[in-house]
Amino acid sequence: MINKKIQQWLGVMILCTALLCSKDIQAQDAADSTRLYMIDEVVVTGTRNATDVRHLSQAVSVVNRKKIEQSMQPSLLPVLTENVPGLFTTARGIMGYGVSGGAAGGISLRGLSGGTARMMVLIDGHPQYAGIFGHPIADAYQSLLADKVEVLRGPASVLYGSNAMGGVINIVTRKMHEDGVHTNLHAGYGSYNTVETELTNMVRKGRFSSVISGSYNRTDGHRDDMGFEQYGGYAKLGYDITDNWNMYADMNVTHFNASYPGPVSAPLVDGDQHITRGVSSFAVTNNYEKTSGSASFFYNWGNHWINDGYTPSAGETSQDGRFNSRDNMMGVSLFQSTQFFKGNRITFGFDWFRYGGKAWTNYVAGEREGTRNDLVDKHEDEIAGYMDFRQDIGKWLTLNAGLRVDNHSRIGTEWIPQTGLAFHLPHAIELKVSASKGFRYPILREMYMFPPQNPDLKPESMWNYEIALSQTLLNGRLNYGVNVFYIDGKNLIMTLPNPNGSGMLNQNSGKIDNAGVELMAAYRINANWSVDANYSFLHMKNPVIAAPEHKLYAGGSFTKGRWSVSSGIQYIGGLYTSVGDNPVTENFVLWNLRGQFSATKWL
């Protein structure tokens, strides 16, 4: 229930909006005829059909292929951290993130973390996370996959269900847009025997298209026992059945070997991980003037082998057991979006997801050598239907509303609503207000694995209230925006003393009370020069680790002929590294300088 303060705040927003809209309605038609919108504002995240972002009431950031290539990073996460306000990812070295103890690659969006399954990564709209642990695998999200990345900041549970509670990162995979053959090789060598390679071939001929990519990356790391090695490939085949119907199939497989050396004060030995992740999908899409839709199937899987290592300085010896897991997630997604009359768009969709796996410990030494201890072997199902409604009212207002009914095989049914208004004002000003609910079901680890497990956990839920203002100036060369949000969440799962016995127990006892401001601006000075900046402030009543209070980025790029140079500086302030009675925060500054020369069309 919205408390009195939030009701008053929303009332003021709506009143201000009404005053702005009524100021000069007659003059708006003239303003509309001269307004210019950038083509990269057409998105598929936050809506199931390609939509001008102006008509959405939620905040969506787009990082295009040019930005990804300029970053010269094998992983997508660094470029997203730079370009998306409110999003922060942890890192631990030159390359690679790893899993389990000492892992980095934790993704936080407005204080909600993917590590706790409160935000989701998608590939072409399909959920991507470990079936048992429910979190994204950071090393699986490589730059070679992406044509662009869209980040929806705020709940996206109406369209994507559980785990999209705090937002989603949607990786839109690459494709060839015109006939021809394009081959690109990226190779680099640097300190600590660091090697980066990527080879991509894209083809389009008539109705057929293909993308084939492969990569190999490695480093010794800046510390002993911190090596990282990764290799993988991606393939996508597409065929235009008719002018209106298309089908494609794709597969991505990556394997990485990572080592964790422990803290400098107490080095760890044999902290090794061997991880393989795979993603595959098949989709048939249709696209007509007044209707579009898709039917798709996806299957994700992972094999994990982990040695947690030991600390000699603490008198420890090599561990007897090795952790193993096999997880998977599959699903079917159907939707059709239709325009029934002018300015209207209604989408009906259906999702079925099945996820889970098994985990066990293999004992390779000690008294239990040659035996196995099973930890979990479970699968759960989700089935959901949803409706997303959008209606233009005149030229100055778009109404958005949505509802999802989601059923979990063990927990039951959740109703997830959202609503919002987008006002298209004179002088290319956009004003948006929204209220949306996010939720997540307990993951298998919380319900069934390790001593704190609790099979009676309930879903977490939250409401996000937001107002956003943006404007485009100078014939589209300058744009800026500001977002203000408030998050009110309940039933967060926490590990606390068992109220009915000894030990610890996972319980629905936590709350979220976050508020923040996000600012962004970009200016295309001329054909060669461009600059951009973003800043986010986050206030958390209950702070969490790896969620900074202040995040600032400012950068610029210069392109001329075959040369391209870009640079950016990032400031992180109030980054929590420890919470509780004695919280600890850190600040740091990171400066990047990148240069690129295209020797040929393919190198």
Language-model segments: what does each one mean?
Residues 392-395, 486-488, 507-578:
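Gram-negative outer-membrane beta-barrel transporters
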Residues 242, 343-345, 373-488, 526-527, ...:
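Structural signature of Gram-negative outer-membrane beta-barrels, strongest in the C-terminal barrel
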Residues 28-69, 77:
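Short, acidic, small-residue-rich periplasmic hinge/interaction motif at the N-terminus
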Residues 156, 168, 173-203, 214, ...:
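Short strand-turn segments of transmembrane beta-barrel domains in outer membranes
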Residues 126-153:
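Short acidic/polar hinge/loop motifs at secondary-structure boundaries
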